[in-house]
Design a protein with these regions (language model features):
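Mature extracellular/periplasmic domains of secretome proteins
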Residues: 82, 109-113, 186-189
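Cap/lid segment of the alpha/beta-hydrolase catalytic domain
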Residues: 53-55, 89, 97-167
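Primarily recognizes the serine-hydrolase "nucleophile elbow" in alpha/beta-hydrolase
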Residues: 102, 171-193
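Bacterial N-terminal signal peptides
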Residues: 5-16
Length: 193
């Protein structure tokens, strides 16, 4: 991990090519029960997506990391983490989901990123929209949705932040409404540290 952090330091201070290589190098980062499926240096530009679609939002240059966390055999927690290419404020913000979750609002990561945060979101451990048929016969997925996906996303994201940016966030925040409010309370009550 030290060599990756050294490469990151060179990448941030020397040239965009090094930053791109450091970002892409995250795909080889060893994580506990998680895999980084994609790590891409993204130039400044418009992003769209998420549940509501909506007008494009301009996001600053960043390293977009996607991954899957599997703490149990039946778990499949998708997450996305955006790390600013420059101007990191030293803080982490995780976004909550609404309703039954089931997707990642990647475009929602643009706003905290513009303010210098490393920002992450998760699908809460399942892919799908309204309804909870995904939980039938899958008690581990229900636990993932209940609290584990949010916590695991936070842990894995902070490990990736340390690897790429060379230090842990000084503060962590959670932003959400609807189910995101419940997620924030579960995280604060179960893991107050």
């Amino acid at each position: 991990m030290r060599s990756l952090a050294g490469l990151v330091f060179l990448g941030v201070s020397a040239a965009p090519l090094f930053a791109q290589q450091a970002c892409q190098g995250l795909t080889s980062l060893a994580l506990e029960h998680a895999t980084i499926t994609s790590a891409t240096a993204v130039p400044e530009g418009p992003v769209t997506g998420g549940r509501g679609g909506g007008a494009p939002v301009v996001a600053p240059a960043h390293c977009a990391v996607q991954g899957i966390i599997r703490p149990t055999k039946d778990s499949e927690i998708h997450f996305e983490l955006w790390l600013p290419s420059s101007g990191w404020n030293g803080k982490y913000m995780q976004l909550g989901s609404g309703g039954w979750a089931g997707s990642i609002n990647a475009a929602g990561l643009a706003e905290p990123l513009k303010r210098g945060y490393a920002a992450a979101a998760t699908d809460d451990g399942h892919q799908g929209g309204a309804g909870a048929t995904w939980a039938i016969g899958h008690p581990e997925k229900l636990i993932d949705f209940g609290y584990r996906a949010v916590h695991e996303t936070s842990l894995q994201s902070k490990t990736i932040i340390r690897a790429l940016l060379g230090r842990s966030p000084s503060r962590s925040y959670f932003n959400g409404c609807s189910d995101g409010g419940r997620e924030a309370l579960m995280e604060a009550q179960r893991y107050p540290e």
